[in-house]
Amino acid sequence: MNSFSAFSEMFGSDYESSVSSGGDYIPTLASSCPKKPAGRKKFRETRHPIYRGVRRRNSGKWVCEVREPNKKTRIWLGTFQTAEMAARAHDVAALALRGRSACLNFADSAWRLRIPESTCAKDIQKAAAEAALAFQDEMCDATTDHGFDMEETLVEAIYTAEQSENAFYMHDEAMFEMPSLLANMAEGMLLPLPSVQWNHNHEVDGDDDDVSLWSY
């Protein structure tokens, strides 16, 4: 048993969307609203070409976050195995925050998903994780193990008050702490400090992958 039947049985009839009332409601779809080109031309595009609120990580997994209406803050929804699961999570949050004016990734999200009664970040995060889990069998490839852990997603679903672009610079800043980190590691393992030349400028050459840190 999968998809919506499992979803309904797991969480009950209360999971029907409050926006589904009224037969004349036609949701706005992301596929009919092309995205604007990313303003950052220097970096690789990570946004999904169609789905709203979905970005790809280097690991191949997909993350989702939504901006709160009339604010610069975002609600983090978690990390997912597939773009479709992340897109479902987005739809839950979009419906909770914007109602019928929400731009959805899937038209049936308006009536298949439970919309939390409050706009509290924790309530939205929980509903988003549950929706992604319920649609896992439908969206994933037909394999024996889809590798999705709802508990892990719920743990990762933490609220962030920063714009998503800041995440890149956080990782970039961590790069400059590597010399002291290696020194601490060497001291802890009673090994000599590796002789690596660190260049403290803002340009990192990604071609130096064959640098050896320790020589045995």
Curated annotation (Swiss-Prot):
The keyword GTP-binding does not apply. Residues 50-107 bind DNA. Transmembrane segments: none annotated. Changing A142V: In strain: cv. Cvi-1. SMART domains: AP2. It comes from the Eukaryota. GO terms for biological process: cold acclimation; positive regulation of gene expression; response to cold; response to water deprivation. The keyword Transcription regulation applies. Keywords: Activator, DNA-binding, Nucleus, Stress response, Transcription, Transcription regulation. A motif (Nuclear localization signal) lies at residues 35-47. Changing V19I: In strain: cv. Cvi-1. Induction: By cold stress. Positively regulated by the transcription factor ICE1. Subject to degradation by the 26S proteasome pathway in freezing conditions. It is found in: Nucleus. It holds the Pfam family AP2. Its main location: nucleus. GO terms for molecular function: cis-regulatory region sequence-specific DNA binding; DNA-binding transcription factor activity; transcription cis-regulatory region binding. GO terms for cellular component: nucleus. Transcriptional activator that binds specifically to the DNA sequence 5'-[AG]CCGAC-3'. Binding to the C-repeat/DRE element mediates cold-inducible transcription. CBF/DREB1 factors play a key role in freezing tolerance and cold acclimation. Interacts with 14-3-3 proteins GRF1, GRF3, GRF5, GRF6, GRF7, GRF9 and GRF10 in the nucleus upon freezing. Belongs to the AP2/ERF transcription factor family. ERF subfamily. This is Dehydration-responsive element-binding protein 1A. The lineage of its organism: Eukaryota, Viridiplantae, Streptophyta, Embryophyta, Tracheophyta.
